[in-house]
Amino acid sequence: MIAAPYTSGGADAALRAARLAEMNRAALAILRLGHVPVIGVNMALPIIAAAQADVFDEVMMPISLALAERCDAVLRLGGPSQGADQEVARFTQAGKQVFHTLAGYPPG
């Protein structure tokens, strides 16, 4: 799983898009290492869009945290983020691996 800031720092659409692009680039690198990459934001955004209502808080973190419980490891990217920190906490509590750089991510 890739955990990184998405909404931290405001609702600037360009910033969110740049952050999501960074997560997706990391996901490609993890895929090339032989793992199946997962990004909570990528799972939640289509559901949020389909709702056609303000369900961001209802959907984003519950989906991301549920995914965290089903993944084997997490790559924590970027700066401060309460959501990403919550995801990492799930991994830590479960005794799963937490990586902070791609350089330390093992081949699958």
Give the location of each predicted region.
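Conserved catalytic or regulatory cores that recognize and/or transform ribose-phosphate-containing ligands
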Residues: 1-108
